[in-house]
Amino acid sequence: LANLSNMAEFLGLKSLFVKDESYRFGLNAFKVLGGSFAMARYIANELGKDVSEIDYNYLTSEKLKNEFGQATFFTATDGNHGRGVAWAANRLGQKAVVLMPKGTVKSRFDNIAKEGAKVTIEEVNYDECVRMANKLAEQTEHGVMVQDTAWDGYEEIPAWIMQGYGTMASEAAEQITDRPTH
C-alpha cells in the first residue's frame, strides 16, 4: 500500500492509502487476479477439487497436465483482462484465444501476443467480440469462456473473476496497520 500522507493532510483525513497494482507480475494491472483465479477455479472444479486444495506449483506441474489435460481459454478484451488471461494460460501450460475489437491499439495487441495467446483484432465492437469468443469456446473441444461480463446462463465464471479481484482487498487488509473507517 502506498501511504499518501500529504494528500490525506490536504483532504483533512487521518490517512489515505492506495493499492498500487502497477507492478503485479509485470503486467501493470490488477485484471490478472480475476482471470487467473477463475481459471484455477475452473481447473479445480473439473478435477473435483476445491480451489483451496491446489496451489501454483500443482497448477504448473506435469501432474496437472496428466490429470487435467489441455484447455483453451477464450476471452474478449480491450486490453488488460485479455492480457491477464493470456498470461495465466501461459503460466499454466494451457492455451488462450483472445479477440479484440476494431480500433484496438497495437501495443495492447502486442502485449497479449507476447504471452503466447492466439490474438486477433476483429472488425466488430467489444460486445460482438464477446459473442464471437463465446461461440468459439462452445465449438472448441475443452474450450472455456473466461469473460468478466455476465449474461443469462453465464454467471459463474464472471463471479469467480470478481472473487479473484477481491485478492486486492485481502492484501490491503493484511498490509494496513489501523482499521480503516471507509
Model-derived regions, located:
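PLP-dependent amino-acid enzyme catalytic core
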Residues: 1-182
